[in-house]
């Protein structure tokens, strides 16, 4: 890579770090090309991205971003997984790491918060933003459904009482 290319790559990576909701750093030593391609496609399908960058360039790109605290994680063969949704990148990385022992999570960042491997793991267990919205909408709709049922119940019970009186009068 020439100097101009490196500058452009660092600028690009800096913008990525600034725009990301979360960043996960992991070792990938020993992973095959097929495994990495599979990992990249799963991350892309979930709305995230995986990049492999030189550690020195990644450290330079981190300067001036909220995720600057993770510079110490860049040692050895590291990859960067990121997404705009704070939950997507950790979730996909942890799911892939369960089935592939070559991917070892080192840590990450979510905004200004630096995360260790355990924090990334616990972040991965949280529901995504869309799932939270669906749950909230369900919680909001449930009381309305119950109120409609309570309001409709007396009318239907009243109709049953009238029907019973009508049958009683017919029988008499």
UniProtKB/Swiss-Prot annotation:
What does the record list as GO biological process?
A: translation
Record flagged with keyword Protein biosynthesis: no
* Domain of life of the source: Bacteria
Any GO CC annotation of this UniProt entry: ribosome
Keyword Translocase attributed: no
Task: List, alphabetically, the Pfam families matched.
Answer: Ribosomal_L10
Keyword line: Ribonucleoprotein, Ribosomal protein, RNA-binding, rRNA-binding
Q: Which GO terms describe its molecular function?
A: large ribosomal subunit rRNA binding
InterPro entries noted in UniProt: Ribosomal_uL10 (IPR001790), Ribosomal_uL10-like_sf (IPR043141), Ribosomal_uL10_bac (IPR022973), Ribosomal_uL10_bac_type (IPR047865)
Give the family per the record: Belongs to the universal ribosomal protein uL10 family.
- Entry function: Forms part of the ribosomal stalk, playing a central role in the interaction of the ribosome with GTP-bound translation factors.
NCBIfam families reported in the protein's UniProt record: PRK00099.1-1
The entry describes its oligomerization and partners as: Part of the ribosomal stalk of the 50S ribosomal subunit. The N-terminus interacts with L11 and the large rRNA to form the base of the stalk. The C-terminus forms an elongated spine to which L12 dimers bind in a sequential fashion forming a multimeric L10(L12)X complex.
Kindly give the PANTHER family that the UniProt entry links to this protein: 39S RIBOSOMAL PROTEIN L10, MITOCHONDRIAL
- What is the protein name given in its UniProt record? Large ribosomal subunit protein uL10
Its source organism is Rhizobium leguminosarum bv. trifolii (strain WSM2304)
